[in-house]
Amino acid sequence: MSSSPKPDWVRAKAPVGPTHARLKELMKQYSLHTVCEEACCPNVGECWGSGTATFMIMGEFCTRACRFCNVKSGKPNGMLDPEEPAKIASAVKDLGLKYVVITSVDRDDLPDGGASHFAKTITSVRTLAPDVSVETLIPDFGGGLKEIQTVVQAAPDVIGHNLETTEPLTLKVRDPRASYRQSLEVLEHVKQLDKRVFTKSSLMLGLGEREEDVLRTFRDLRAVGTDFLTLGQYLRPSQRNLPVIEYIKPERFSYYQRAAEQLGFLYVASGPLVRSSYRAGEYFLHRMIKPIT
């Protein structure tokens, strides 16, 4: 465990600005959740200040309990807000967003893991805000291929699914129901269903991973056709979560970025404060996505 104080390079700016305030007000108005707040993302100030947000659907309680995550774990008992897809679409339109990320808690209590709710949300956003590019960050749906197909058929521009860590650390870091190989299969199946959909994954560093395992993870992701990759520093959100083993220096993130780019990823974001939806709508990604929509 790292006993050193948090270095300057992982200290984020406090959220400020009129766009941030307006977005926070809209979230309350529509009774919506953002992963920006629920997961204590360090970039909430930067992203909300620029009018970008990641919406978290299907409630605030996750049926899993990954040891890195700050989202509440509990029993949603099959409950879903049927108006949520329309609420998110209205919020996206009201904010004038051009790029939206939709993620969720895990919902193992639902027959389809919430795949149909994902699809309804994507369709609602497309209907009300047709010019918006849509990225989804999906759970593994228990490995259900039919559920993955449901999301793919709703035609998001990007489908992300996070490995989170290297294979040797997966049992320590993720919920026991998650699997490194199953997550790779999720990403592979998306590509098999529709090669036009960009796929994306993310890793946290600083949990005690070995360099050779990180590089092997890059190769595993490319082997299943993953297009985009993000790498960021794990930051302990609370005392009940895993401790930080190491604060990775910025130059090490640069090294990993170069290594990933050499393997053929179309886009790599690598840095201490990078998260899976970090600057997801930035110009480079937007240019790549729009021609296929």
Region roles according to the model:
Residues 1-54, 58, 70, 86-93, ...:
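Auxiliary Fe-S-binding modules of radical SAM enzymes
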Residues 53, 57, 75-83, 109-113:
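Short coil/turn segments at secondary-structure boundaries
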Residues 58-65:
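Short pre-active-site segment immediately N-terminal to redox-active cysteine/selenocysteine motifs
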Residues 73-100:
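Conserved alpha-helical substructure of the radical SAM core
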Residues 75, 101-111, 141-144, 157-180, ...:
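Conserved radical SAM core fold
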Residues 100-102, 134, 159-161, 229, ...:
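Hydrophobic residues within beta-strands of alpha/beta enzymes
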Residues 131-144:
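Short, surface-exposed recognition loops or helix-turn segments adjacent to catalytic cores
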